[in-house]
Structures are given as C-alpha cells and as structure tokens.
Amino acid sequence: MINVFQLNYEARLRSWYELRQNLQNADVQTKCVIIDRFWQSVPLVNHYLHPYDIDNWPDPWELVAENNYCEIARGLGMIYTLFLLGIDDVDFCLATNDNSEEVAIVLVDNAKYVMNYWPEMVLNISSKDFSIKNKLDIDKIKNIIGDT
C-alpha cells in the first residue's frame, strides 16, 4: 500500500479531504481510530515544531503542504482533523510515559481516547499510563484554523 505522505501535495490534500468526508457520520471512537491510523503513517523527523511556539505553527493546509512531521506536528494533524470534524473536546499534552519517555499525546472526550502514541492503540491505553507535564493551549490551536 502506498503511503500518501510520500505523494505530492495534491494527492496528500485529496486523501486528507476524503478521510474527513468518510468520517463525517462516524462515532467519536471510530473517528479517533481512523484519524490516528492515518496520521501515524507520516514519516517522522526529530524536531519540526516547538511546543511553546504555537503562534508560529502552520495552519492545517500548510502542515499538509510542508509535509514535515515530528511527534508534535503529527499530533497537530490529528487535532486539526478532529476540529474540522466538529470534535472539540480535545487536549494536547506533553507527557512522560511509564518508561520515562517524553511524548506528545492527544486526549479526546475527557481523555477517554488517547491518540498519537501507538498505532492501533487509541482505545487500549489509559491516560493513567502517562504523567502529564504540560497541556498546550488548545484555544490558540483552534485560532490557527479560525484565522485561515
């Protein structure tokens, strides 16, 4: 299967649009699983976005166009997709897992769903497995979409 993130901008944009269209009527659980699976396929770099420089983060379409993803950028793609589907009970957290590794996790529906950790594990990981170090300003992230 071809990784959409290895294709050109138009193909990535079309695939992301089709993902959102296909999930319009899905329940929150299904949306979380499919969105996580989609964004988990991005090729990762070590550092792209700084967690405390939200004002300079790309909007959703710039993110897809630039096609550079660290764990934070991958989580941001998930959040943008959730927001565009009308899901706004979302938190973006910097945390450490039970192995003391730093992670950027997306919590949905009052932390019922944990995204941006392991593929296919959206429903199987408890937020208790993490020590939340900082919650990023979700309103600033929402404003990025509002400004486009």
Regions found by a protein language model. Give the residues of each.
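A structural boundary/capping signal
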Residues: 1-148
